[in-house]
Design a protein with these regions (language model features):
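Short alpha-helix
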Residues: 161-178
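A short glycine-rich, Lys/Arg-flanked "PGG" loop and its adjoining helix->strand segment in the class I
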Residues: 109-124
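Conserved class I S-adenosyl-L-methionine
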Residues: 1-24, 37-41, 124-153
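Class I SAM-dependent methyltransferase SAM/SAH-binding core
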Residues: 29, 35-85
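Core SAM-dependent methyltransferase catalytic element
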Residues: 177-178, 192-200
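A short acidic, Gly/Pro-enriched loop at the edge of an enzyme's catalytic core
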Residues: 87-96
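Conserved S-adenosyl-L-methionine
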Residues: 180-190
Length: 200
């Protein structure tokens, strides 16, 4: 069971679950949860009323079920795309978060409004994403994706879109969607080992 919660790329330093605020008794959603390690940590150590870990990957969902299925019903592992999930979950969540998850891999003009609708009044969205591209290239100055090489669970070549955007671009997107009290922090990676992270 993960005993720490990290936002940075290296998963080894910086702020932890406190960035989410007090989630005790709250309904929480992890967007693009992968193997649900962050969601499992919250379920065990921070006592939310309910936490839903959403991921579309069958392989990730299977691994999460093997590792953390025993944490039900507090932890719900949901195999689904984040957009359809959020669009059918209006005013469900007190807190939504993404640790290098769906926020970086979903068109922000679609995801951010869906997240805003799924949050209850006064709800919070917190996420971490790349502050620059993995190869060191700067983040995009406008809303455009980068094509990434990937592999399917069967090992076949595939492509993914990733949105690596400059701070002012994210800030404008969040503001246009209606989010308020927007703040950001750059978590610097170890030189030569890990990229910098931007946490919102």
């Amino acid at each position: 069971m993960p005993d720490r919660f990290f936002w940075n790329w290296g998963q080894d330093s910086g702020p932890g679950a406190e960035a989410l605020g007090d989630v005790t008794g709250r309904c929480v959603g992890d967007l693009g949860a992968g193997t649900a390690r962050h969601a499992a940590h919250l379920a065990v150590h921070h006592q939310p009323a309910h936490i839903t870990a959403v991921d579309a990957s069958p392989a990730q969902h299977a691994m999460a079920s093997d590792l953390y299925g025993h944490l039900a019903p507090r932890l719900c592992l949901t195999r689904c795309g984040v957009l359809p999930h959020l669009r059918t979950s209006a005013h469900t969540y007190d807190v939504l978060y993404s640790v290098f998850g769906a926020i970086g891999f979903t068109e922000p003009h679609e995801l951010l409004p869906a997240a805003a609708t799924a949050l209850r009044p006064g709800g919070r969205l917190t996420f971490s994403t790349l502050a620059h591209h993995l190869g060191g290239a700067p983040a995009h100055p406008d809303v455009q994706h980068t094509d990434m090489s990937a592999k399917t669970p069967d090992g076949e070549a595939a492509h993914m879109h990733r949105w690596v955007l400059q701070e002012q671009v994210w800030r404008q997107l969040l503001d246009e969607t209606g989010f308020t009290r927007i703040s950001t922090e750059v978590l610097h990676g170890q030189p030569g080992r890990a990229p910098s992270t931007r946490s919102w």
